[in-house]
Swiss-Prot record:
Expressed by macrophages in various tissues. High levels are found in spleen, lymph node, perivascular macrophages in brain and lower levels in bone marrow, liver Kupffer cells and lamina propria of colon and lung. Also expressed by inflammatory macrophages in rheumatoid arthritis. Induction: By interferon-alpha. By viral infection. Residues 20-136 form the Ig-like V-type domain. One of its GO terms (biological process) is cell-matrix adhesion. The keyword Glycoprotein applies. Keywords: Cell adhesion, Cell membrane, Disulfide bond, Endocytosis, Glycoprotein, Immunoglobulin domain, Lectin, Membrane, Repeat, Secreted, Signal, Transmembrane, Transmembrane helix. This is Sialoadhesin. Interacts with TYROBP. Interacts with CLEC10A.
Length: 1709
């Protein structure tokens, strides 16, 4: 309420015509610190008092004391300071209203406030009573007022009030704890002179659920809160009445105690009386518990109870009591004849549950197809005779009826007449006749019309005949058989219903069958069967052998050999013999017994609930069978303890070591059966069945679940939401009551764990509805209890009501109302207040516009031919026994809709028309607008939208908008979706393989199609799986294949993938619109290499590589091995008895059927470990300045060795984890003389160690280039030989690129003008009295601008449209090359290639650029090559001429040396050469000559003439160039050149180098005598550890370390190719070294003598002599070359190298 209305309301309290003086305001007003308050006030004065200048309104605080001015309408300055800005006069003196507003209240504001008004000096009035204001720090709690008695179904008001009111901010009262669906609140505020207050009223419809509810009223003011509460006591009739049945959760058996308890969930006041009813009849019991001491058939029925209190009563839902028992009734009751109908009925007491399942047994054998309570034997036959009983079963157990006998009378069947002969002498015959009949028949046995025996006593009295009889059985024994005893014997059977006869042809001369060595043999033993007969042996005699009555073999032999008898050979054998004239009778059967060890046992476990009758409880059955002969000893073990054996025992349970009396053991041959009554927890788990006899043993295992753990839910499995549920895990175990932990599972997922056997759900919520199970954790292997379903009941939630509009089918709407409730709710749909349909049935005719369909908690109403009158509010109400709720929506019928022709369901490419329809007639000029997925379609403005061939991208939601001319409103249609179907596309087939223990293969096929496609997965031509039938194929499904199907997805899992599963799989996808397919190769990795003892072994160890194959046909496979990609041998495994480093390589095996490509395994690498060897220690010195020395130690070791480097006994460095394996590097920066000396390196690994040492000498002489090492061409350069240790006189010798340049006393070389010829490597030697010292080479670089640019081109003869353009230049530093055409850059050497379209591959080298050009035009093209570096640039132009010619070689381009060769330049296309034509030839781009003839002839081609040739034809019409061709001249190897190098100090290392010249390349071999030492072919010779071979084209080098005596001798180097061969030989050994030493000693002696003579010649002659001696000494110390007829030996000093002439060999190292 606004402030002004409140003032007007306040002014209304002043009556008109008031004639007295006075002020009215509340007695007291309350406020809270920080808030505000209003003091309502009105005043009055006589009507005759004149008001000349208005009325002055004044409010005072503490009027009788301090009299502080609070508000002054005339002079605000008089207001007390503490009230300024916090008070506001809200009244209007003219209307005699004097309200005062106090803001930002403080506790100090408490006190009396008085109002005074002044009209004139005479007329003024003060209120002496005033208003008491109270301001507190905290608000007082609100006051709640409620009715005295609350009764269910009544409506009451609860009032909450507070004295606090503030106009500036809201003072809020709020009710809490009420049910919003059944309550409403409203508030009011009081501003009157009589008082101020705020009231909040709660109006509620009382329900029994409100009993005990706490209502709270909360006050919010000035950031403070306070609340009051009230507890409701609602009287109501009893609620939640139901009957609890005990026992529950299982079947109630006859004789058991049954208790029915009437439970009342809530009642206020308490229940006063209980009534019981059975089948609607009232019982005498008036207590809350009904006891049935011994349940009987008559106790079954429907029970209810009624609870009553002072308010009302309630009847419980009915509960059915069923006594779980059965009995069988047979009809007819008398004798039963064949072809009569017999009916057996399995009767149960009343109120039998509907979920009963019936089973029928005949002679204790289950009848598979009989599962109803009635068993009918139509046209009964003799086979129906037997004992019958029925079994009723539900989820809690089963119960069997007593057996009844059914006997079907019938006449005798055909008798069975058999004959036997005595097996040894054949003098006794036995005939046996048996028959089946009911009642028993009389049997008569006769021969030739003469009765020999009968069951009635008539028989032949001859002593040779003796007969015995039994029920339906007759036996006749004939002694001293005679020929007359042969013939036809007849057996007749007769009873009251008929008779039957059979005959037998008996032969007294029947054959006999003998078994050798015995009738009982062991499997695998040889057995001979012999057939003896009385027939004379003749050549045409034939013997027939029969096994179990079937012909087995026929032949001339009287013996049948079984070379290795098996269990399948066991059985009954007989034989026949015949010749050309007669035949013997069949022999008597002889039984062959084959003994064999136990096969795999069959072990099954089962649990029967109440299988043996009422109260029997649970019965566990463990059954173990085995196939063996002799019968096996069976033994059942549980947790390594023998439970039962098949051994005979003296009685009791001694065989199981003191078993429980609950356990019953049944034994039979090859069978062991154990029954456990009420199994305990300790008896659950894994059982092992072992079978053994004298020939072997076998075993198998199975898990037994005795349901020792049972989950019970109390009070019931079905509860109301908000009640309490107790879940108890009952465990039957030996240690009952001992502490245990329990695991709880909800819907199969672990839910909780703890020591409590009972879990309480309080309150029960609907989300608690689930399958619950439990398990005890104390016992290992304990089984889960049987899951129990908890159902939760709750009233309906608020329904969900939706409306769907279908504009394509006659303007139809579909209303769908769904709700969540349990039990199911009754749904009702209203239009306004008109009921349209309910879930019980439609309220309108279903054949009209309305069509209703109801499902569980769902109601659908279809409204056809919508009209504008169908718009409005629709309401759906849901009701069940627990409550009700409703919801509503407003439905608007649109003025327009979209019609689709032919249908919204379309195929891709189909024509479709969309029409925009409206309810009323369409006026002319109506405009239309179409939208797809909410976006306007600009191209269509007519009433129809057409698609000649719709595509997938055009699918979507379409709607239209129609607007009549001159109308401001539009008709908007609801969207309608177009669904476009299409054929399968984008088929993908993915294969994965997991090589873990399960070897799981996965094939996943996906496709994009609509409608979803049918997927078929084929392996070759075999169907493996499909989306229709899962795993399938002609041979049936395999248990290894698991199929998962989803829309457009087919997943195949192959468990235990094998070799046969590999190959190409095809996935075919098809729907009604088309098909597509994809294929993939599946690799099951079924072939693997197994290495024993492992993939990492030590050198010299035994290694075995086995090819493992997962396959079903291992015997039909062949094996192939590959070592480093090379095929090795065919075997299942490869033994390596003494593995070496050469074996450390990659291995793989291939497996496949003969004649087919093998399936290869994945390669596995064999890692061979060996001790450290080939330890090398080297050093390098920096070439410039010698400021860095590098010491490098390397070793060959596996595993990598630990390297340590030391100098003078001091460790300098060692390898770490971050070091390069088998390498140790030491850098000495600024080395000093003290760093010289011997360095040692040691290599150590777990397999061994090695050591080596090296002397380090620092370099003292170096070459200095001034001003720098790189100078421009033409600049001066000085090369200085710096030797700090030189002493005059010093002789300096200079070398350029390894060649001697000059020598003299000058230490420098000066070049005034540097040219490119000066570039290269410079080194020097300094020689003085101390000796000779050499420097390392220093490189001089002369820089110059690019020059000699050459642009050449040719066309590729292999591809007519491709040409090659090459640009080369000479420059230093290298130039940057660019190739352009028509001003566009095609390629550069800096890496920017293919800048223009049409360019091809680019090759870049130093100062060279090569470009392949594709699609070359027919005409000539001009190309520009530009070269540029820092010193300048150059460019050249070349033309890519049209290839109009081709070089033709006769006989070819590969020609033997000395043969004749003609190269012809042939023109392409057009006429041949004419007059004035010239042909120029080029060899390696060098012009040879020009001739008028197109042929270049070679009479005897030589190897020097090999190279590149092309021709240029200059014709009158223009020039034509050919592409170059390569000419190869072939020649046999010349005599090889063989060089031998021996280390001069000790001769411990040597090198043999053999080279040859040949074309094609030759194959080189090196022999020592007859031993092949090395070859240029791969794996040509087994290399020894100390011999290293290096092969290159036409060259073979052999390094021999630690030279042995066996390595010395005459070596022969042979070279051969297809044209011939050549060889040479030389001696290699220390013999040449000894000769060299002797020669050196001789040189020293001669040199000394010559030196003494030359001293006499003077200083000049001495100088000349000294030079010659130095050179000779250098040669003697460092290099001596001895040339013999067949050997060349060169020794080198590793610390120095010299060259006398340009022809000396370069130093090695």
């Amino acid at each position: 309420m606004g402030f002004l209305p409140k003032l007007l309301l306040l002014a209304s309290f002043f009556p008109a015509g008031q004639a007295s003086w006075g002020v009215s305001s509340p007695q007291d007003v309350q406020g809270v610190k920080g808030s505000c308050l209003l003091i309502p006030c009105i005043f009055s004065f006589p009507a005759d008092v004149e008001v000349p200048d208005g009325i002055t309104a004044i409010w005072y605080y503490d009027y009788s004391g301090q009299r502080q001015v609070v508000s002054h309408s005339a002079d605000p300055k008089l207001v007390e300071a503490r009230f300024r800005g916090r008070t506001e006069f809200m009244g209007n003196p003219e209307h005699r209203v004097c309200n005062l507003l106090l803001k930002d209240l403080q506790p100090e504001d408490s006190g009396s406030y008085n109002f005074r008004f002044e009209i004139s000096e005479v007329n003024r009035w003060s209120d002496v009573k005033g208003t008491l204001v109270t301001v507190t720090e905290e608000p007082r709690v609100p006051t709640i007022a409620s009715p005295v008695e609350l009764l269910e179904g009544t409506e009451v008001d609860f009032n909450c009030s507070t004295p606090y009111v503030c106009l500036q901010e809201q003072v809020r009262l709020q009710w809490q704890g009420q049910d919003p669906a059944r309550s409403v609140t409203f508030n009011s505020q009081k501003f009157e002179p009589t008082g101020v207050g705020h009231l909040e009223t709660l109006h509620m419809a009382m329900s029994w659920q409100d009993h005990g509810r706490i209502l709270r009223c909360q006050l919010s003011v000035a950031n403070h809160r306070a609340q009051s509460e009230i507890h409701l006591q609602v009287k109501y009739a009893p609620k939640g009445v139901k009957i609890l049945l005990s026992p529950s959760g299982r079947n109630i058996l006859p004789g058991e105690l049954v208790t029915l308890t009437c439970q009342v969930n809530s009642s206020y006041p308490a229940v006063s009386s209980i009534k019981w009813l059975k089948d609607g009849v009232r019982l005498q019991t008036k207590t809350g518990v009904l006891h049935l001491p011994q349940a009987a058939w008559s106790d079954a029925g429907v029970y209810t109870c009624q609870a009553e209190n002072g308010v009302g009563s309630l009847v419980s839902p009915p509960i059915s009591l069923h006594i779980f028992m059965a009995e069988v009734q047979v009809s007819p009751a008398g004798p039963i004849l064949e072809n009569q109908t017999v009916t057996l009925v399995c009767n149960t007491p009343n109120e039998a549950p509907s979920d009963l399942r019936y089973s029928w047994y005949k002679n204790h054998v289950l009848l598979e197809d009989a599962h109803s309570h009635t068993l009918r034997l139509h046209l009964a036959t003799r086979a129906d005779t037997g004992f019958y009983f029925c079994e009723v079963q539900n989820v809690h157990g089963s119960e069997r009826s007593g057996p009844v006998s059914v006997v079907v009378n019938h006449p005798p069947l055909t008798p069975v007449l058999t004959a036997f002969l005595e097996t040894q002498a054949g003098l006794v015959g036995i005939l046996h006749c048996s028959v089946v009949s009911e009642p028993l028949a009389t049997l008569v046995l006769s021969h030739g019309g003469h009765i020999l025996a009968s069951t009635s006593g008539d028989s032949d009295h001859s002593p040779r005949f003796s007969g015995t009889s039994g029920p339906n059985s007759l036996r006749l024994e004939i002694r001293d058989l005679e020929e007359t005893d042969s013939g036809e014997y007849k057996c007749s059977a007769t009873n009251s219903l008929g008779n039957a006869t059979s005959t037998l042809d008996f032969h007294a001369n029947a054959a006999r069958l003998l078994i050798s060595p015995a009738a009982e043999v062991v499997e695998g033993q040889a057995v001979t069967l012999s057939c003896r007969s009385g027939l004379s042996p003749t050549p045409d005699a034939r013997f027939s052998w029969y096994l179990n009555g079937a012909l087995l073999h026929e032949g001339p032999g009287s013996s049948l050999l079984l070379p290795a008898a098996s269990s399948t050979d066991a059985g009954s054998y007989h034989c026949r013999a015949r010749d050309g004239h007669s035949a013997s009778g069949p022999s008597s059967p002889a039984v062959l017994t084959v003994l064999y060890p136990p096969r795999q046992p069959t072990f099954t476990t089962r649990l029967d609930l109440d299988a043996a009758g009422a109260g029997a409880g649970r019965r566990g059955l463990l059954l173990c069978r085995v196939d063996s002969d002799p019968p096996a000893r069976l033994q059942l073990l549980h947790k390594d303890r023998v439970v039962a054996t098949s051994l005979p025992s003296g009685g009791g349970c001694s065989t199981c070591g003191g078993c429980s009396p609950r356990m019953k053991v049944t034994k039979a041959p090859n069978l062991l059966r154990v029954e456990i009554h009420n199994p305990l927890l300790e008896e659950e788990g894994l059982y092992l069945c072992e079978a053994s006899n004298a020939l072997g043993n076998a075993s198998t295992s199975a898990t037994f679940n005795g349901q020792a753990t049972v989950l019970a839910i109390a009070p019931s499995h079905t509860l109301q939401e908000g009640t309490e549920a107790n879940l108890t895990c009952n465990v039957s175990r030996e240690a009952a009551g001992s502490p245990a932990n329990f695991s709880w599972f909800r819907n199969g997922v672990l839910w909780a764990q703890g020591p409590l056997e009972t879990v309480t759900l309080l309150p029960v919520a609907r989300t608690d509805a689930a399958l619950y199970a439990c398990r005890i954790l104390t016992e290992a292997g304990a089984q889960l209890s049987t899951p129990v379903l908890l159902s939760v009941l709750y009233p309906p939630d608020r329904p969900k009501l939706s409306a769907l509009l279908d504009m394509g089918q006659g303007h139809m709407a579909l209303f769908i109302c769904t709700v969540d409730s349990r039990p199911l709710a009754l749904l009702a749909l209203f239009h306004g207040e008109h009921l349209l349909a309910t879930s019980l049935g439609p309220q309108v005719p279903s054949h009209g516009r309305f069509q209703a369909k109801a499902e569980a908690n769902s109601l659908k109403l279809e409204v056809r031919e919508l009209g504008l009158g169908d718009s409005g509010s629709y309401r759906c109400e849901a009701t069940n026994v627990l409550g009700s709720s409703n919801t509503s929506l407003f439905f608007q019928v649109r003025g327009a809709w979209v019609q689709v022709s032919p249908s919204p369901e379309l195929q891709e490419g189909q024509a479709v028309v969309l029409s925009c329809q409206v309810h009323t007639g369409v006026p002319e000029g109506t405009s239309y607008r179409w939208y797809r997925d909410g976006q306007p379609l600009q191209e269509s403005t007519s009433a129809t939208l057409r698609f000649a061939a719709i595509t997938l991208t055009q699918a979507g939601a379409y709607h239209c908008q129609a607007q009549a001319p001159g109308s401001a409103t539009t008709s908007l249609a609801a969207p309608i979706s177009l669904h476009v179907s299409y054929a399968p596309r984008h088929v993908t087939l993915t294969t994965l393989m997991d090589t873990g223990p399960g070897r799981l293969g996965l094939l996943l096929c996906r496709v994009d199609s609509d409608p979803p496609a049918q997927l078929r997965l084929l392996h070759g031509d075999r169907l493996v799986a499909s989306t229709l039938q899962g795993v399938g194929g002609p041979e049936g499904s395999s248990p290894r294949l698991h199929v998962a199907v989803a829309p457009n997805t087919l997943r195949l899992e192959i468990h235990g993938a094998m070799l046969e599963d590999e190959g190409v799989y095809i996935c075919e996808a098809s729907n009604t619109l088309g098909q597509a397919s994809a294929s993939a190769d599946f690799d099951a990795q079924a072939v693997n290499v197994q290495v024993w003892p492992g993939a990492t072994v030590r050198e010299g160890q035994l290694v075995n590589l086995t090819c493992l194959v997962w396959t079903t046909h291992p015997a039909q496979l062949t094996y192939t091995w590959y070592q480093d990609g090379q095929q090795r041998l065919d075997a299942h495994s490869i033994p390596l008895p003494n593995v070496t480093v050469r074996d450390a390589t990659s291995y793989r095996c291939g497996v496949g059927p003969p004649g087919r490509a093998p399936r290869l395994s994945r390669p596995i690498t064999l890692d061979v470990l060996y001790a450290p060897r080939n330890l090398r220690l080297t050093y390098l010195l920096e070439s410039h300045g010698g400021q860095l020395a590098l010491v490098l130690c390397t070793v060959d070791s596996r595993p990598p060795a630990q390297l340590a480097l030391s100098h003078a006994g001091r460790l300098l460095a060692s390898s770490t984890a971050a070091s390069v394996p088998n390498t140790l590097r030491l850098e000495l920066r600024g080395p000093q003389p003290r760093d010289e000396g011997f360095y040692s390196c040691s290599a150590r690994s777990p397999l061994g160690q090695a050591n080596t040492s090296l002397e380090l000498r620092l370099e003292g002489v170096r070459v200095i280039l001034a001003p720098e090492a790189a100078v421009p061409e033409g600049a001066p350069i000085t090369v200085t030989c710096a030797d700090p240790a030189a002493h005059a006189p010093t002789l300096y010798t200079w070398y350029h690129n390894g060649r001697w340049l000059q020598e003299g006393p000058a230490a420098s070389l000066s070049f005034l003008v540097a040219t490119r010829a000066h570039a290269g490597a410079y080194s020097c030697q300094a020689q003085d009295a101390q000796g000779t010292r050499s420097s390392r080479p220093a490189a001089l670089q002369v820089l110059y601008a690019p020059q000699d640019a050459v642009l050449s081109s040719f066309r590729d003869s292999r591809a007519r449209s491709m040409a090659v353009i090459q640009c080369t230049v000479d420059s230093e530093p290298p130039a940057e090359l660019a190739l352009s055409h028509d001003g566009k850059v095609l390629a550069t050497s800096s890496g920017v290639h293919s800048l223009a379209s049409g360019t091809g591959h680019v090759q870049v080298a130093r100062n060279a650029l090569r470009l392949q050009v594709q699609d070359v035009p027919a005409g000539d093209d001009t190309y520009v090559c530009t070269a540029q570096n820092l010193l300048g640039s150059i460019s050249t132009i070349g033309r890519l001429q049209v290839e109009g010619a081709r070089v033709v070689a006769e006989p070819g381009l590969d020609v033997p040396e000395g043969a004749a060769l003609n190269l012809s330049c042939r023109l392409l296309g057009g006429p041949g050469p004419v007059g004035n034509s010239t042909f120029a030839w080029f060899w390696n781009d060098r012009r040879l000559h020009a001739e008028p003839v197109p042929t270049l002839a070679f009479t005897h081609v030589a190897r020097a003439q090999a190279g590149m040739y092309h021709c240029l034809a200059e014709l009158p019409t223009g020039a034509a160039a050919s592409a170059p061709v390569m000419l190869r001249v072939l020649y046999p190897p010349k005599t090889p050149t063989m060089m031998v190098f021996v280390e001069p100090e000790g001769g411990l290392r040597g090198i043999l180098d053999c080279r040859v010249d040949s074309e094609p390349l030759a194959s080189l071999t090196l022999h020592l005598g007859s031993r092949l030492v090395a070859s240029s072919q791969p794996q040509g010779a087994p290399a020894e550890p100390h011999i290293h071979v290096l092969a290159s084209p036409n060259a073979l080098r052999v390094d021999i370390e630690a030279l042995r005596p066996s390595d010395q001798g005459e070596y022969i180097c042979s070279a051969s190719n297809v044209l011939g061969s050549a060889s040479t030989s030389t001696y290699f050994g220390v013999r040449a070294l000894h000769r060299l030493h002797q020669f050196q000693q001789l040189l020293w002696v001669l040199g000394l003598l010559v030196g003494l003579l030359l001293l006499l010649l003077g200083l000049g002659a001495c100088y000349t002599w000294r030079r010659r001696r130095v050179c000779k000494q250098s040669m003697g110390e460092n290099s001596v070359e001895m040339a013999f007829q067949k050997e060349t030996t060169q020794l080198i000093d590793p610390d120095a190298a010299t060259c006398e002439t340009s022809t000396c060999a370069p130093p090695l190292g």
